[in-house]
Structure formats: structure tokens, C-alpha cells
Swiss-Prot record:
Domain Helicase C-terminal: 231-374
Induction record: In rich medium highest expression in exponential growth, expression decreases in stationary phase (at protein level).
Helicase ATP-binding domain mapped to chain residues: 35-205
Name used for this protein in its record: Probable ATP-dependent RNA helicase YfmL
Entry EC number(s): 3.6.4.13
InterPro entries in the cross-refs: DEAD/DEAH_box_helicase_dom, DEAD_box_RNA_helicases, Helicase_ATP-bd, Helicase_C-like, P-loop_NTPase
Catalytic activity: ATP + H2O = ADP + phosphate + H(+)
Amino acid sequence: MTQTWPFLHNAQSFIQENWNASGFQKPTPVQEQAAQLIMDGKDVIAESPTGTGKTLAYALPVLERIKPEQKHPQAVILAPSRELVMQIFQVIQDWKAGSELRAASLIGGANVKKQVEKLKKHPHIIVGTPGRVFELIKAKKLKMHEVKTIVLDETDQLVLPEHRETMKQIIKTTLRDRQLLCFSATLKKETEDVLRELAQEPEVLKVQRSKAEAGKVKHQYLICDQRDKVKLLQKLSRLEGMQALVFVRDIGNLSVYAEKLAYHHVELGVLHSEAKKMERAKIIATFEDGEFPLLLATDIAARGLDIENLPYVIHADIPDEDGYVHRSGRTGRAGKEGNVLSLVTKLEESKLKKMAKKLGVELSEAVYAGGKLKTK
């Protein structure tokens, strides 16, 4: 494959070796399309579904462009949550193996003094949450004048009011000729408008999941009364091989579902945005080990969550279009098989069908009978 993907063919040996060791056969469409644009120094705004390899799409060219002999930060990657920052940081750590490049993670809630010590080791790449990165810039601990590239991961979240001004301030601390790379699973028009103001003549990439990949994720819905959704979740939890990330609308609903399911002796984990970092990590690790079938979460709590080979996503409460894309993208990642189940009332059925049609999702009705899930 190194011969047919120009970027990889021309990349430094450590990138080629790590690629060969990864077992990847070929780049995903977003990786292939973004690499050359980034190498050419262009600003990029990219939309590509969750699970299509967006992190590597920018990480590999960013690693390729770093000059190890220069001792200052050359790339800053911003992400909206601590979990996502740590995931991206791990990707950078894995793919810089065999090189002299150094990276540091800067997240809120962690010890500032330790982070300042990290910066004294002259990392080439910074991965961080906007609040903590800006705090260290203001404290003159993080120097931005030599930063050549800024990456905004999950851009749709970074332009929300709670992050937008901080993100803009961080970008303003760099020189005008810096490169801006924006990657997101969904790209609303207002998000794109904000980014166009910040970027310089950006190339806009909109990559769809291939038909073959999309076909590996089965989208189904089950009809029940609102009051029976807990009972249905209880039944689904007993399906063979059931391991599902169950999305609910808000923290109030989360508590209601969790209490009722626990009352019926359903083993589950609960992720809410107020959970402590260690507590979250423990719940996620236990779920990944298959200790319980259902992990309940709100959209905010699940930000940056990446569970490998997750077989099911369940929408206990119906989201909007962007929410459906983000949530459903947690299963069937990197071309693997997956299942998306929506629990809907008769009234919600038409809303779901309209949404599926707009998103180009093939949807079928299913029923739970005889301990199995059957297509109606």
C-alpha cells in the first residue's frame, strides 16, 4: 500500500514502520484526501463520520511535518473533553514511536505544576483542552509564536459558547501564517461559517461513510410505550452478546432509567458528566471487560468515549440528526459490524423515519420475541 498512497510512500521511515505494524491495508477516504492538503500547508475543514479514522487523518501529516531539531511546540491539538484529549495523546504517542518527537497532554483537573514541568521538556506537539491550554499561555508557560499548526478535533463542540472564545483566543496567539485543521463528524452551516472566519482559504472536505462500511451497521427500531422502555431495555440486556452504550436525553432521565433498571436487577454502569475522572475510567474499563451489558450515558458524558468493537448502540431517547450520527458512530467503527437500536413510541416513529431518510440510513422495524431480536 505504501506504493499506492503517495503520502505514505514519501513519509519518514518511522511512520511507514508504524503503519506496517498497525495492520492497516489502506487509508480511509478522509485520511487519503486530507493528507496531501495538510502536507501542502492548506487550512482544512473536514467532515467525516465517527469511526472513519479522523484522528490519523491529521495526526500522520502533522507528525511528518514536525522538525525534531527545533525545541519549541510546533503543533497544538485542541479537543473538548479530557477523555478525547487522552485518546488523541495516546494515538500521537503510538505513532511517533521510533522518532525523536516529544508530546505532552494538558487537561483541566490535572496538576498544573506537573504540566509546567512537561513543558520544560520542550514537547513538539501539545494535545489539550482549550481552558487549560489558554491558562498556560496566559501564564507565559506555553509559548505559541513558533506553532505552525492548530488542530480542532470535534470542531462542532469547540465552537459551542463554552469553548468558542477560548478557542479563538488560542488561535490569535499564533502567527498569521499558521495552519488550521478542523475535523468533525458533523458540520453545521453555522460551524462552517465560524471556521471560515478563522481559516485562510480553507479546503472543505465532506466525506461520507462508504456504502460497504455503512452496510455493516444495522439500524433498527422497536416500538413501545414510553413507560415500557425500561422493561424493553431489561429484555434487551439479556440478548446473547449484548454490550450496549445506551443513550438518554439528560441527567434526569439517566437517573430514572438507572434506578428502574437496578430495581429489576439489571447489571449496568452509569456515566454522567459529573463523575470523577477515576470513577469514569473504572466504569468504562469494567464495561469493556464485559462485566455488565448496559452502559447508560448522556451525550455530554459520552463525548470522547471510544469503546473498541462495541456491538450495540441503543437510543433510549430519540436524539436530533447530529446526535444520531455521533451516537450511532460509536458502533461499527473502522468498517466493523455494528447494531443501532432506537426505542420509539408510535409518535416518535415518524420522526425517526424522517431523520433516517435525511441521513441516508436504511431503517427496519424489529421486535423482541422468544428471547431474540427479529426483523419485523
